[in-house]
Regions:
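Hydrophobic alpha-helical scaffolding
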Residues: 34-38, 67, 131, 151
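Short, flexible loop/turn elements at secondary-structure junctions
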Residues: 3, 27, 65-67, 94, ...
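Ligand/substrate-recognition segments at binding pockets and active sites
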Residues: 16-17, 49-117
Length: 182
């Protein structure tokens, strides 16, 4: 509730689209999940207060991401999250450092990276992957999707799995790239 995706997308020239979940719109199993956690500062502040944090007593977190992405997105997140009681420190690193510290060693609190790979939902079913997301229901739904012999049935299992991941909110999908061809 604390991240204004529309503002982020607008700052990028409105060429990208809101994603809302782990499956992009061009992949099997896609469902528009952007409505699960709409931007709502009051709701975000309420949840932060329930957790014991306010703008006067913020939760301190560090966001580690590769400096190849520039600083604007990190600055936007820092500004947006400050409004709900999160003091975000930005740790810009070389991509090679990100690969070692975050991806290989899992040494991070928050991270930001361009996950533009197609058909990569399986990563959400692999607790050893650097997300360390572990939900047996998601793993079972994904296994059913792979075993299904009917494409529509497989898509339904993928949709259920993706919705569960999104509801658990182990990540925030800031936006998807809109492919443009000239």
């Amino acid at each position: 509730y604390g991240i204004n995706h529309k503002e982020i997308i607008a700052s990028r020239g409105n060429v990208d689209y809101a994603l809302g979940g782990p499956i992009p719109s061009v992949d099997p199993g896609y469902e528009d999940l952007t409505g699960l956690y709409p931007y709502n500062v009051d709701k975000a502040k309420e949840l932060m207060k329930e957790a014991g944090y306010t703008t006067d007593k913020p939760l301190r977190l560090t966001l580690t991401y590769a400096n190849t992405y520039g600083t604007e997105l990190g600055d936007q997140l820092k500004s947006q999250l400050a409004k709900i009681g999160i003091d975000l420190k930005i740790n810009y690193v070389e991509f090679s450092t990100w690969l070692q510290d975050v991806h290989a060693n899992g040494n991070y609190e928050l991270s930001l990276v361009d996950h533009a790979e197609s058909h990569d939902f399986y990563k959400w079913t692999t607790p050893e992957y650097y997300y360390h997301y572990d939900n047996r229901n998601v793993q079972a739904l994904y296994a059913k999707a792979l075993a299904a012999t009917d494409e529509k049935e497989s898509d339904e299992y993928l949709k259920q799995a993706a919705k569960t991941v999104s509801e658990d909110a182990p990540a925030d999908w800031l936006f998807g790239y809109r492919v443009t061809v000239a």
